[in-house]
């Protein structure tokens, strides 16, 4: 089985202790099991409603649990994360989503005004998903929480590859932001090289499960 972050999540979540926390944000606490179910539900929804393997997913949010859940959903559904600095103005956000050919955009409700400016300029975006309270959603927009909690949370039956991609856009200090493409197995190997200096590290998913 390939070293892919989706496979890693599928491997470790079932063997973690009940109640083991994955995300803590203020008063919110989300266990690994909860994040696993929610990310599977979200990933399945995207694949069943217009997104295809390898499609880009634009993240237009502040740091919050939904960001990490959506990232996990992308890993598990073989979709490609595209980051954007939430401080960007509409034209800058448009550049990144257009340049990356984003097919899905997940955004925080506080950015709705900018998103409404962007929609007509991004005709190739198939799904708009809003993270908020679900109130007064714009037309053709899905409520994140409803998607994350709808379904059984079962693992996706997707054959992943180590060459699946993760996009990280640069800050654009020497021009416009550039989309740096990381393969899952290359990013994992970079992390593992540093960890080897501290001792033995798992070399297979089976070793990881037993670690």
Label the model's feature ranges.
Residues 48-49, 76-149:
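Structural core segment of the AMP-binding/adenylate-forming
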Residues 31-33, 165-193, 198-203:
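Conserved AMP-binding A3 loop
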Residues 57, 74, 105, 170-173:
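Conserved S/T- and glycine-rich ATP-binding loop of Class I adenylate-forming
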């Amino acid at each position: 089985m390939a070293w892919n972050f989706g496979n890693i999540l599928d491997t470790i979540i079932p063997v973690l202790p009940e109640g083991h926390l994955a995300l803590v944000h203020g008063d919110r606490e989300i266990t690994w099991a909860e994040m696993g179910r929610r990310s599977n539900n979200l990933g399945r929804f995207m694949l069943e409603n217009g997104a295809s393997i390898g499609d880009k997913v634009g993240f237009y949010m502040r740091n919050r649990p939904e960001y990490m859940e959506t990232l996990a959903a992308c890993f598990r559904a073989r979709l490609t994360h595209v980051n954007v600095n939430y401080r960007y103005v509409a034209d800058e956000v448009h550049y990144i989503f257009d340049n990356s050919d984003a097919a899905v955009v997940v955004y925080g409700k506080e950015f709705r005004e900018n998103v409404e400016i962007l929609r007509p300029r991004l005709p190739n975006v198939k799904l708009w998903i809003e993270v908020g309270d679900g109130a007064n959603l714009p037309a053709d927009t899905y409520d994140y929480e409803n998607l994350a909690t709808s379904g059984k949370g079962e693992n996706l039956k997707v054959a992943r590859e180590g060459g699946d991609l993760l996009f990280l856009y640069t800050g654009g200090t020497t021009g416009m932001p550039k989309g740096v493409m990381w393969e899952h197995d290359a990013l994992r190997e970079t992390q593992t090289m540093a960890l080897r200096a501290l001792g033995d590290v798992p070399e297979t998913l089976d070793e990881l499960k037993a670690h």
